[in-house]
Amino acid sequence: MPKSVIIPAGSSAPLAPFVPGTLADGVVYVSGTLAFDQHNNVLFADDPKAQTRHVLATIRKVIETAGGTMADVTFNSIFITDWKNYAAINEIYAEFFPGDKPARFCIQCGLVKPDALVEIATIAHIAK
């Protein structure tokens, strides 16, 4: 089955050569997502909860554009800039995954913009 590109309405232009998501064989792959506005400026610079909420809402939009829901998410890769934000990020994360949680990993690292606090990449399997 061929790959389909997923670009939700209102998406910002990526900073590099990639798209927000792709769909292949019922699997949605969501690119690393940060809390950016439509001009790739970081939103909520000092607020890990607001950034996480924005990131996950953006991911949800990509998955819904592909025909899925957040319940279809099977794996998240989470990148954070400071462990002090871990609890705040998890608090918002739990709101988006209230039932069975997807598998995931979380690492501390630098991100593409200095004010970015969290980046998440996602895989979801859409039921046929």
UniProtKB/Swiss-Prot annotation:
**Pfam families, sorted:** Ribonuc_L-PSP
Write down the superkingdom of origin: Bacteria
Instruction: Give one GO molecular function term.
Output: deaminase activity
- Which GO biological process categories is it annotated with? nitrogen utilization; uracil catabolic process
Q: Does the keyword Ribosomal protein apply?
A: no
Q: Does the keyword Hydrolase apply?
A: yes
Catalysed reaction equations from the record: (Z)-3-aminoacrylate + H2O + H(+) = 3-oxopropanoate + NH4(+)
Which GO cellular component terms, listed alphabetically, does the Swiss-Prot or TrEMBL entry include?
cytosol
Q: What is its EC number?
A: 3.5.-.-
**Keywords recorded for this protein, A-Z:** Hydrolase
Entry-linked InterPro entries: RidA_CS, RutC, RutC-like_sf, YjgF/YER057c/UK114
Q: Which class of enzymes does this protein belong to?
A: hydrolase
Q: Subunit composition?
A: Homotrimer.
Family recorded in the similarity comment: Belongs to the RutC family.
Q: What does this protein do?
A: Involved in pyrimidine catabolism. Catalyzes the deamination of 3-aminoacrylate to malonic semialdehyde, a reaction that can also occur spontaneously. RutC may facilitate the reaction and modulate the metabolic fitness, rather than catalyzing essential functions.
HAMAP family xref list? RutC
> What is this protein's name?
3-aminoacrylate deaminase RutC
Q: Origin organism of this chain?
A: Escherichia coli (strain SE11)
- Gene this protein is translated from: rutC
